[in-house]
Amino acid sequence: MEKNRCHVFTPAHIVNKMLDEINYVDKLYGKTFLENSCGDGQILCEAVNRYILYCKKEGFTDEKIACGLEQDFYAVELDEVNFEKCKNNLNSLLDLHGLKLVNWNIFNSDFLSLKIHKKFDFIVGNPPYVSYVNINSENRKFIRENFESCKKGKFDYCYPFIELSLRYLKSGGKLAYLIPTNIFKNVFAKDLRKLLQDKVSKIFDFKKIKIFAKFMKNVATRSLNLT
């Protein structure tokens, strides 16, 4: 699918805020977690670190922690280089905590076409920012045929990521996404806003902070929390 994407990863302080806002801090064992465009693991590694610290605080054995990591965490990354970096970063984290390697459920694939037969308690992410003009015709066709928010008009690449995440979210689950502010005003995001209107619990505006100013011009961001 769309490999010509913008690879800009999430700053650590924003990662922590997103996880804090959805209360990813306690009673984490057995709670499923998905990051669907994980890059080199900025968000995923912090979530895994919190999970391990919680388990150790509860006195869980290393074997039980490893089992939980294999069952509770899923991630997807299309770019092969970032996919390998993410696995290496996660394995380094295991080593830091004195844990053996685990079989991570991380997929080097396109989230939009991948089938995951599971729903999640937590979905956190920073989906790729790609405008309609930079999506090739094949991908436009696939997205338009498979996502209600993209049936009409000039959708951005993050729209189907948001819609698909809602499908994977458990009832009562929580989602935190870092997204461009234009979805709140773009005429072509009207159908996406309809999908979101009864589900949003909080919106944080980072326009003044300019999280990605070093890398991207004309992109303001907001964190969107759904419950």
Regions of interest found by a model, annotated:
Residues N4, F9-I116, I179-N182:
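Conserved S-adenosyl-L-methionine
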Residues K3-N4, V8-K17, S37-C45, F83, ...:
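Signature of N6-adenine DNA methyltransferases within the class I
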